[in-house]
Amino acid sequence: MASPALSHFLPRFGVAAAVAGVLSLTGCQTWNAQDTLPPTSGVQPLKGLAQNVSVRRNAMGMPLIESNSFHDALFALGYVHASDRINQMVTLRLLAQGRLAEMSGSSMLDADRYMRAVNLKKSAGELYKASSPRLKRFFEVYARGVNAYLFRYADKLPGDLASSGYKPEYWKPEDSALIFCLLNFSQSANLPEEIASLVLAQTVTNDKLAWLTPSAPDENLPLAEADKLQGIKLNGQIPGLTELSNASEQLAALNLLGTQSSNNWAIAPQRSRSGKSLLASDSHGPLAAPSLWSFVQIRAPKYQAAGVTVAGLPMVLGGFNGKVAWSLTSVLGDNQDLFLEKIRRQGSSLTYEVNGKWQPVAVRNETYFVKGQRPIREAVYETRHGALLNSTQAAAQGTGFGLALQTPSFTDDKSLDAFFDLSRAQNVERASDATREIRAIALNLVFADASNIGWQVTGRFPNRREGEGLLPSPGWEGRYDWDGYADPMLHPYDQDPAQGWLGTANQRVIPHGYGMQLSNSWAAPERGERLAELAGSGKHDSRSVIAMQYDQTTTFAAKLKKMFEAPGMAQPLKQAIDALPEAERSKAREAYTRLMAFDGKLSPTSADAAIYELFLQESMKQIFLDELGPQNSPAWKAFIANGDLSYAAQADHLLGREDSPFWDDARTPQKEDKPAILARSLAAAISAGDSQLGGDRRAWQWGKLHRYEWKNANGQSVRGPIAAGGDHTTLNTAAFAWGQDFNTTRAPSMRFIVDFGQSEPLMGQNGTGQSGNPVSPNYLNGIDPWLKGQYIGLPMQPQNFDRVYGKTRLTLTPGK
């Protein structure tokens, strides 16, 4: 799905690499890495089961769980999740709790402070309390399965976890609600954008912020948002902003759940070759081992489902149940707002201003247990809007601005029950009913049965009295406060449209003037545009849908050419190129000619694709580096981070904004305009290519600049580099940090397709592997199929189980 924040795998903080962990785990020469792999055959007695459960695995290690009761299936799911991904589960839980320093040391303390302030524990408690007794029982049984693994393998944990020295606590049912809340928290891109805007405000004046935070190509600049900050001196007035920005960067590097970027679509029967629906889904994240997603299939009386799960959460979040397919992407809804709070110390108390009066903050105490150090006890301060993300520094300084975070409440929220009901729905109408009850997470849910398709936006979105929430709001006035939430009946939805398809790619999904505030932080529109081009052309089957998932054509290239040829640009640009020094002039002319001939196909072997991407990279530096640089400055880093989260000022300036103040190069005495900067950028693209790819420009290849490289939780390379095509605007996403380098930061971490025209509709692929244990054969075995476009079928009919899963099984039996 799409990207926040803190979009999207797992921590590259200081847990030792698995190989090093294997060598240093106990100092015992007889320790065997293979002992950390639970068996996949034979008999395993486990206390807590009522009856035997069979676990078979396919060639990719994806499990089929067969049981005589749903409770036993959930118990087995907990055991299997822990067997495959215990390090991921433990790390996600610590991340959500704000306790990473316990495993990784003081380097994660700022991130822990950030997450303690966010207080997902409170949100998870509300969500779990509001759930039905049925759902709580499901989570309890799942937790017992996780704990059965922890009890049996306490001394045989995977090397990376064991070498950290951290002893995992037993799993609690509420921990699964916590993982769900973490998934939700990762879905809004706007919180890190708001933090980044404050970092930018330390370098540029408030009136320029609007030029750096556009919403969409056809939207006016958010000048009113910037106006609410007029007269407020932000430079140097936010204690702890550096630490907060560092924490936000750390969380972005961890990528939380890596689901802010994603695609999904459904093809209606009239556009299908078989006359039956199709559904496709792919979610994007860093090239990490393991990826976020874990495939599983469950077959029990009155319940069957297969698809993708997140270890720690006993739900099939996207997949197929034999009748209905469902998938999710991030809607990038904005339901997280930062409020600037005027603070001052009065005696021993910290106070903040509300409508001209000063009142005390609320206080809660937090204790941080830091690996290798004494515990640290600190206060978190809360205003009427929420906790101060910079509590420690604000209290120490006693003046300036606190940063309060407001998020929706989950009181009386039945989202967990609704997600389970979605996985049991037997037709699109029932699926639609279930999705309308999902409030605790902002998603585009696309679903289908053999004859119908549907789409529903879920979540809880605030009604703001004034403002859009795109930039931080003054908290001392009531003008910008929330006034309840949008009526769920206003949430966008559609079913069986005349066009014959539905699809989302994190793009804007509501028209101008829509009756609710959903977001102003949409992704760039190009993936959605390409999806519409392909979905709306001809008839489809699973082969054409696979081709869509692997498509590397960008629609941005055609827009760029249109801009070059626009009546007000063509002649001034030619004149600007002619005015360059001779050496630069010839380079600019070559780049222009090649770009005008470029077909938009970002193949890894394409020379023109290399020139195109070099131009994009160099133009960003030419436009913005003079005011936001140098390249290691906080402002530049914040700007790059914003460009990765939603529609970027880089693209916005290239396609328009001729009156932007950023076209002038502040380093020169004369005033430059857009044609002059574009001419420089064209020449710079060729110079950069000469430097990086050599002098034979016809032999350049995009894939020699742009690579796939998979890394483990410690940031060590485990596979690659391998030439990559595409970029952040292609359906087959291979994003890079625009303005930094061409290293792939985000790519599909899973894909699945449901073709109702097939006797066995579901097929899928994992981005790396099913297991998070480096000694497992299923640790990286998903990469080659991913590179080759190969999917594995997940059959729903029992007579086909042996063909895919074989006859070898692990039998879990009731223990004493």
UniProtKB/Swiss-Prot annotation:
GO terms for molecular function: hydrolase activity, acting on carbon-nitrogen (but not peptide) bonds, in linear amides. It comes from the Bacteria. Residues 1-33 form the signal peptide. It is found in: Periplasm. Disulfide bonds: none annotated. Its main location: periplasm. Keywords: Hydrolase, Periplasm, Quorum sensing, Signal, Zymogen. The keyword Signal applies. CDD domains: Ntn_PGA_like. The active site is at S262 (nucleophile). Its EC number is 3.5.1.97. InterPro entries: Ntn_hydrolases_N, Pen/GL7ACA/AHL_acylase, Penicillin_amidase_A-knob, Penicillin_amidase_dom1, Penicillin_amidase_N_B-knob, S45. It holds the Pfam family Penicil_amidase. GO terms for cellular component: periplasmic space. The keyword Hydrolase applies. Catalyzes the deacylation of acyl-homoserine lactone (AHL or acyl-HSL), releasing homoserine lactone (HSL) and the corresponding fatty acid. Possesses a specificity for the degradation of long-chain acyl-HSLs (side chains of seven or more carbons in length). AHL-mediated signaling mediates quorum sensing in many species of Proteobacteria, regulating hundreds of genes, including many that code for extracellular virulence factors. Belongs to the peptidase S45 family. This is Acyl-homoserine lactone acylase QuiP. It comes from Pseudomonas fluorescens (strain Pf0-1). The gene is quiP.
